[in-house]
Amino acid sequence: MPPLKRSLLIFAALCAASLTSAQAAQPSVDPEFAADVVDRYANHIYYGSGAIGMALVVIDGNQRVFRSFGETRPGNNEHPQLDSVIRIASLSKLMTSEMLVKLLDQGVVKLNDPLSKYAPPGARVPTYQGAPITLVNLATHTSALPREQPGGAAHRPVFVWPTRQQRWNWLSTATLKAAPGSQAAYSNLAFDLLADALSTAAGKPWPQLFEEQITRPLGMKDTTFTPSPDQCRRLMIPEKGASPCNNTLAAIGSGGVYSTPGDMMRW
């Protein structure tokens, strides 16, 4: 099967699963089952991780189980809570994928739309022997783009580079070493470009679109790219010298989301 067609089928299956799982009837479950499993394995997971702290949310049918371990910051002796703020990093990509599914369902975009359709005026999107980068390539790590944009200062804070303008400027000078859809290679850059494209297609800034389509309907009040002073005070810090509590609008699609265990439980 051609790589692009295979990618489309895989992505379509993922989309279908994500849309139908929430619609399925809630299964009958043992009321103690989820809690028993969590209590059996959670300590092992935490102590084997080497993490400063861990918040664990498990949803099984209509059960919701929350457990926390360790500290929210080195030496503060405070366990993570449901409202502890966490950088969810690459789980942000699942929310970007959800946005793609929603806009597909609304007829705003198509999987095979070329990225160039949503490029800023004057920007160039590279092709490989005429084969374009499509939205499904970006979403399935088959875009032939690198994992990260080359350059950037060493030891910089996380999720603040490259900005939208910087990545599109770089893309205009980039070349592809393989045809999009021909091979899989993980790319954070691709997911930020995907979010840019979806924002353009919807005609709204990504934070507004993100709030309207994902966080507001579910009451996810602590899920954001621009944390407030109160949210920054609740941010879990893994080590001294960790990245400051900045806005992370540069990494809208790949990893910039701040959230809480409580919000992730709603999602």
Predicted regions and their residues:
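Bacterial N-terminal signal peptides
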Residues: 9-18
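Short, conserved catalytic-motif segment at the N-terminal edge
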Residues: 29-86, 108-110, 169-174
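Short, surface-exposed loop or secondary-structure junction motifs
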Residues: 73-74, 126-267
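Hydrophobic (often cysteine-bearing) scaffold residues that line and stabilize catalytic clefts
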Residues: 30, 34, 38, 88-92, ...
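Bacterial N-terminal signal peptides that target proteins for export
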Residues: 1-9
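Residue-level preference for non-acidic, small/hydrophobic
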Residues: 42, 56, 62, 93-96, ...
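Short active-site loop at a secondary-structure junction
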Residues: 48-55, 75-137, 176-189, 252-255
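Boundary at the C-terminal end of the N-terminal hydrophobic targeting segment
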Residues: 22-27
